[in-house]
Amino acid sequence: MKKYLYFPGCSLKGSGKAYEESFLAVCKALGMDIRELEDWNCCGATAYMSVEETKSYALAGRNLAIAEREDLDVIAPCSACYLVLNKTQKALKENTEIRRKVVNALKAGGLDYKGTVKVRHPLDVLINDVGLEKISKLIKNPVKGLKLAPYYGCQIVRPYATFDDQHDPVTMDKLMKAAGAECVTWPLKTRCCGGSLTGTVPEVGLRLAYIILKEAKKRGAGAIVTLCPLCQFNLDGYQGKIASKYESVDMPVLYFTQVLGLAMGLPGSELGIKRGIISAEAVLAGGGLR
Amino acid sequence: MSEQFEPKIVAFFCNWCTYTAADLAGVSRLKYAPNARVIRVMCSGRVDPQFVLDAFAKGADGVLLGGCHPGDCHYAEGNYKTLRRMRMLTRMLKDMGIYDGRFRLEWISGAEGDKVKSVINDMTKKVRALGPLDLPGKFKNWDKEIEELEAQVNKGDKDKEAVHAG
Amino acid sequence: MTENKSKKETLPRVGFYICHCGSNIASMIDVLEVQKYAAALPGVAVSREYKYMCSDPGQEMIAKDIKEHKLERLVVAACSPNLHEETFRKAAAKGGLNPFFFQMVNIREHAAWVHEDKKSATEKAKDLARAAIARVRFHKSLDKKRVAVDPNVLVVGGGIAGIHAALTLANAGKKVTLVEREATIGGHMAAFDKTFPTLDCAACILTPKMSAVKSHPNITLWTYSEVSKVEGYVGNYKVTVTRKPRFVKEDLCVGCMECIDACVFKEPKFKDKFNQGLGKRKPVYIDFPQATPKVVLVDPETCIQLKTGKCKQPCAAACDRKAFDFNQKAETKELQVGAIVLSTGFKTYDVARSPQYGYGRYPGVYTALEVERLVNASGPTSGEVVLRDGTHPKAVGIIHCVGSRDAKTNKWCSRVCCMYSLKLAHLIKEHSGAEVYNFYIDMRAPGKAYEEFYDKLLGEGVHFIRGRVDEVTDWAMTPEEEGKLVLRVEDTLAGFVRRIPVDMVVLSTGLEPQPDAQEVRRRFNIGCGSEGFFQERHPKLAPVNTFTDGIYIAGACQAPRDIPDTVAQAGAAAAEALSLIDAGFVELEPNTSHIVEEECSGCKTCVPLCPYSAITFDEAKKKATINEVLCKGCGVCAAACPSGSIRQNLFEDDEIFSEIEGVLAK
Amino acid sequence: MLEQKVKYEGDCDKEFAKWVTSQTGGENLRHCIQCGICSATCPLSLYMDYTPRRLINMAREGFKKEVLGSFTIWLCASCYACRVECPKEIQVTDIMYLLKRRAIEEGVYPRRFPIPVLAREFGRMIFMFGRVNETLLVIDLFLRTNWFKFLGMTGLGMNLMRTGRMSLIPETIKNRAELRKVLDALDADEKSKREAVS
């Protein structure tokens, strides 16, 4: 059985706790050998990347350097981390100047990086390494009657991911169907939710989030299922403000790992189901789940 | 600023693909290093390993051989024969101490003007880094050494004779 | 060794000429310096520079010098030999010198145009000149070999290009075989309703030419057939053609179509390829009423008899000519031709590669070819613009450049899309009265009366929005967008993003090379450009010629091209073929190989090397011999001969060794 | 009051245009055919003063003042839609990044976009702890930019508390010294660069 390193990133330790809880629970249930990256630091995230490029490369570089010692694939569930780590990989490979700067900086810290680490997303690993077949076998109570709007957000399939289609990604749909859920087809799968702006330019962020939530509701989804802590936070956390600015949508936003966990018969408490600000209880009950 | 070494590269281009590609590069005004001297042959298969050896012997720092892509040869399969011959030749040259891309075989189709540019630029860069091969010079030195050696030997003999005489 | 030899002999008198080519060469190479340098080289009797060597005065100068200065060799430093070698050989001959006592130096394409430093470019020119002067001494007096040209012609591809080329040749009295892959000739044009910019009906102008092909005494028409093998050389090609089985005897069928009515399938239920799947057909079918030849055929994929052998075969029964033959097998035919015209056409871009436009996901999205059938009076809806769901569109969006001008799909502009989009916009508006929006990046209407056609459309009130559409979705944000297809685009001329709801989307797909273009070009031993279209010999001066003499290209197999240009090119290709045939013979380059018998050790190394089996072994003499008619002059044998007894004219060892020494000697 | 719209060649800065195309990510800028698909696909373009397409053209023509002063670069949410759609493979997102950096350097970014502040606090926090505590970051940010907006956020704060998604204790890494060495080394590198230039 293949071994993996796990890069949580800051969000999964904070507002994205439920993602970490459910992801690790599912890995455990699948018997995956996965270990948290030793003494990892913040990846730099896109906000930082946009103004302090080289530094964020170095931040990501330190994590990659630590991972390289172990010579294992790194799983980064957070979209921002996934993007930044991959972008760093690419920059270090293709841009000699950046490589020089970053590698020297790392040396100063007593670190060394050759550039061999593979940064991967849980979807990629679950579909391509574990395989739908094995997952389907472990589905004890399929979430029948649960109608989901799979929402991938921006930074997973764009621009670096190679494991899914950039215009119409399907990996999460496959997993959710395997879990017994029904997936609505909708065109906003990969449209930005404005998460990175809600904090700084709220009026804009809120509108983008509202558009996503409203369309999901219109398509008859009981809940949105996502794979990005920032998207989850943005779509879940601001529904109060959205209600006052536009209209109340009341749309629970789950992590795909939570739904998968439930279908595999794991208790909701281990999957952080209660951490949603918009409660998913009712919808899940509809899906025959407690 | 010190004059940097400019390698001399002899290039054998097949008429149908690589020579045409070089013409195309010209028509498209692509700019590349002026170090290669093209000798036109009808097919890369006409290139006798002796030509390559002769080029090195006469002072080339690099030899480039360009033909049609496998399967595209104007003469059906000439380039396959080239490939076989040149594999052997490459090993031979290695034994003679000529390697590190001083001899290079490239498939360049008539449409790949840009490849002519990149290949010649790249090869010029690499061979320049390797420095002069200068076989003619080496030959001279070797001749000189041998002459000196002979001279010494002859001298030695004379001394002996002297001793006997004494 | 070569060099000693050259020193012993008294050197032949060489004339060296260097061309300025206006400023093309002179701007990057110090022509005078090279000319002076050459003058001082051993054996050079005359060294001159001139503004345009290829001009008449230039050639005259050479001819005159040869006589006056008793020149024995000629070297011209100018452009590529592919361009002017023949010109200067003729000049040599004019001066009374054997044309092969000439060597050309390429200092334009290979030096002046590709370098930026005048000093090093000039040095390079000197080296190349010195090499040619050293080499030309070893040249021998040669004669071109004449071979007769077979007057028959093969035309491959029965679209408008092939049809026009075949008719032109046949009218000139040549026997033409036209080979078409599909069951009927006509190509893409046969599917169109109207043609831009004149809006005359495609069928009205095409079908007469199609029947002319069928009835022409000089044309043999082989449809449902493909060329499988090509051997030989210019003037003498041997071609093998495979004829697929129609399961109907072509010579017996009169196209009454009784059999189609009789078929066990009472209703047509299979995807109709000719109608882009918008219509249905039976297992026994004919593409369209004017199909040529008007002969039915049976589809082995769907015919019960052919699949299971268990059918009552009412079709065969209904045929009073007894034309059906379910045991028909593919047959191969061979023919001899002197020239070949390739007009294999194009393929349209596969819209599945652009999922963002929703083709296949939203039934309201169509490809341009589908719409051609939809607006076609003889199409599946008899020209009525009805959507797949039976409704009539109130608003239609036409997206230009789908699969064109895009690094992710095809980089090139497909040249015809702007114009056919205008045509479709006009026809859709005319047939349905719908609001029509054209989404374009740049409007390209460069042909005769094309801009006027654009102007006409502007007058008709068609909307033109300059911007590339991002995506087609069913995502509504306002009430009027509900239930519509929404196109999101920046109106780049207004400077803001717009969302435009429509009922029908037309994807103006670009043109691509045929999927099997690579195999075909290998079969005919020609080249393809990097984008995959057939490569012409020269983009301006030899647009229908290829690098293989006697093989010509016409139409969209060479590059995206509209009907007027295609027909013009087909005519040009036919003319090239005619000039080859009517000359009656071709002169082949004398660069063939021969064996110096006394030096041949009889080792047989060369025999298996020749791809044309031109080398045989004379058991009596224990020597190899080369048939110079079969030899194509690659020189592979010469390179391989251990005893060096094989000599390739124009590329003898002496010549090449001296050239090597020439470029290196300083 | 009417504003003059004509631009004179003197109004554009060719050096700036050269600079943009010379940066990593800016390479293909000159190849833009102004098809506008970047604007069409951009979820934020409806708020931008100049659409991405217009910004690209202004940048390559050297209208530095307008480009660096625009909201556009600050509204980019780095969703990379434009980068994926661009038929000329222009790295629009990265161009937005490098324009942001330049705007900060020249101190011309519009005050209402506290992204630079966010970034600075972000950096400070990482330097201190090696990781980022979102709660502290957000509080910090709002206190520095617009504190009554912060009051508006308390509702969300309570919710996060309730669901145990908010902690006020910063996460820290063990080997902070190592990380600081790395970051300092970069600063040093930058400094030496700048000195080399001046």
Identify what each model region corresponds to.
Chain B
Residues M1-G166:
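Iron-sulfur-associated redox domains of electron-transfer enzymes in respiratory
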